[in-house]
């Protein structure tokens, strides 16, 4: 019954702290209005009072069910144009907006916690709000498949992302017919806060952002709705301005970790292929998580002329990383800028590194900042986006042999050691495992054939081959473990492909030629 669900959602708002006790009547009336109801029946309210009270834990578990029933009712009553995932997402965001505090209240509370308790207390509050508001859809995030893979470079994180809903055909058709709008300009713009959304743009009435001053300019802080790792946040420029890696970038990253020392923050590179999916709006990504790259040790200490006070080294990592650390962030900014400028103009034909071809620049950096006690630390990942006939998607990009698992750009998150793999792999791997258990060939399968060479390459490591009969001795659980391990090893190869200097004697010698160039 919809009135009961209205009371249940109101209680959810009170228990989670989205709404204050004084907001109860107001919230009920707003929800009645949304569902085009004139009253709350006394007997419904009386019966509800006798129920077991909600707790924070039961509230979290209950939200998906409450919203599902509300959406079913809205569909039956014609309150949505179509009963599809796109329109349901637009409408349930509108439902949740009825519980939300105004932006000014959120900012005041965040700043109060920051000033009187700690930066972590402030982010704890804001992250919980972003989850409780259903801006971060916890019940979808739980569907993501996650595991780890041990390698000589450390423990890599692997995830198959299932929390982004598939676009339904009706929504795709409607989006094509919809009037094209330039508002908000992109998914990151501050104008998204409170926006009702449309068929080709997500609703954001339950979205809140926090103003932060970084390096003297106006930026904003929010969480990613897809949370690839703990407290995955986005820090974005108040202006819709393109990504650019420059001296000021290092200052902004270090300023942010000075203000939020429990978070790391990094920037995608500013060139296609080696950059992220949004190059049109300057932004960083951070969070409360330590990636494999952050844990990776320095394999070779180096020094830079005039910066003997700055600790520097090449990181033991499949991509090409210079780590620098110092007590004074100004020294890091100076050195990072020197390395960036040297790399932008650097060509080493013997190592197949070209600063530009036909006037198109190729060299850039993916920078990551963090605090280590009293020290500031920067990891500078050298990137190059040159393409060739043999590698049309990029020489320093996953090569074709690995595309059956990962062909998308290697952005900041992957660089640090977390594979974000496409949703298609969930079914493909399940079908692949079943075919292996049954001893049937996958070369004839239209979808699975792309995995055949890979499978035939790794199976002998585990003592059997296709159709040998020995696969019958392997349990489904063990086979699943094997496939997950091998996907992790593919991701390691993906990172090695993306590294401009390979982890070989020849590669490290070439790396040192660049270090010498910086020192020249």
Where are these regions (language model features)?
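Active-site microenvironments that recognize anionic phosphate/pyrophosphate groups
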Residues: 1-235, 239-242, 316-318, 332-336, ...
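Helical scaffold of the NTase/Pol beta-like nucleotidyltransferase catalytic core
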Residues: 206-208, 238-265
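Catalytic or ion-translocation cores adjacent to nucleophile or general acid/base/metal-coordination motifs
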Residues: 248, 257-280, 286-340, 344-347
């Amino acid at each position: 019954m919809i009135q009961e669900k209205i009371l249940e959602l109101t209680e959810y708002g009170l228990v989670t702290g989205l709404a204050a006790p004084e907001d109860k009547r107001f919230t009920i009336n707003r929800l009645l209005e949304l569902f085009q109801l004139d009253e709350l029946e006394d007997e419904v309210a009386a019966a509800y009072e006798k129920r077991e009270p909600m707790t924070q834990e039961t509230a979290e578990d209950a939200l998906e069910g409450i919203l599902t029933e509300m959406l079913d009712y809205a569909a039956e009553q014609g309150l949505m144009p179509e009963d599809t995932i796109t329109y349901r997402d637009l409408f349930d965001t509108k439902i949740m907006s009825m519980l939300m505090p105004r932006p000014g209240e959120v900012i005041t509370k965040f700043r109060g916690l920051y000033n009187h308790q700690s930066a972590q207390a402030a982010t704890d509050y804001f992250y919980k709000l972003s989850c409780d508001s259903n801006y971060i859809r916890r019940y979808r995030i739980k569907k993501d498949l996650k595991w780890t893979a041990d390698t000589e470079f450390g423990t890599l994180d692997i995830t198959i992302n299932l929390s982004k809903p598939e676009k339904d055909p009706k929504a795709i058709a409607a989006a094509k017919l919809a009037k094209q709008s330039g508002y908000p300009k992109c998914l990151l713009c501050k104008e998204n806060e409170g926006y009702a959304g449309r068929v080709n743009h997500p609703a954001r009435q339950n979205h809140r952002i926090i103003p932060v001053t970084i390096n003297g300019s106006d930026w904003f802080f929010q969480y990613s709705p897809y949370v690839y790792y703990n407290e995955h946040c986005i820090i974005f420029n108040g202006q819709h301005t393109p990504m650019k890696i420059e001296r000021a970038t290092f200052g902004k990253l270090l300023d942010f970790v000075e203000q939020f020392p429990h978070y790391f923050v990094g920037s995608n590179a500013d060139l296609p292929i080696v950059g992220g999916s949004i190059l049109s709006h300057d932004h960083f990504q951070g969070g409360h998580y330590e990636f494999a790259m952050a844990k990776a040790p320095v394999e070779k200490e180096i020094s830079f002329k005039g910066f003997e006070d700055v600790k520097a080294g090449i990181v033991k990592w499949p991509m090409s990383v210079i780590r620098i650390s110092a007590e004074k962030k100004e020294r890091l900014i100076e050195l990072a800028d020197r390395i960036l400028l040297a790399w932008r103009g650097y060509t080493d034909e013997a190592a197949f590194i070209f600063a530009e071809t036909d006037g198109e620049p190729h060299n850039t950096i993916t920078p990551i900042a963090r605090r280590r006690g009293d020290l500031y630390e920067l990891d500078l990942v050298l990137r190059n986006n040159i393409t060739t006939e043999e590698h049309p998607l990029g020489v320093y990009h996953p090569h074709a042999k690995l595309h059956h698992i990962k062909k998308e750009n290697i952005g900041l998150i992957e660089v640090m050691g977390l594979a974000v793999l496409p949703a298609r792999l969930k079914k493909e791997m399940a079908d692949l495992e079943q075919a292996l258990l049954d001893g049937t060939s996958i070369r004839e399968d239209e979808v699975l054939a792309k995995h055949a060479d890979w499978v035939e390459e790794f199976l002998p490591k585990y003592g059997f081959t296709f159709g040998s009969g020995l696969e019958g001795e392997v349990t489904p659980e063990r086979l699943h473990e094997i496939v997950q391990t091998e996907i992790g090893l593919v991701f390691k190869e993906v990172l090695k492909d993306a590294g401009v200097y390979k982890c070989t004697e020849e590669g490290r010698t070439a790396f040192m030629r660049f270090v010498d160039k910086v020192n020249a």
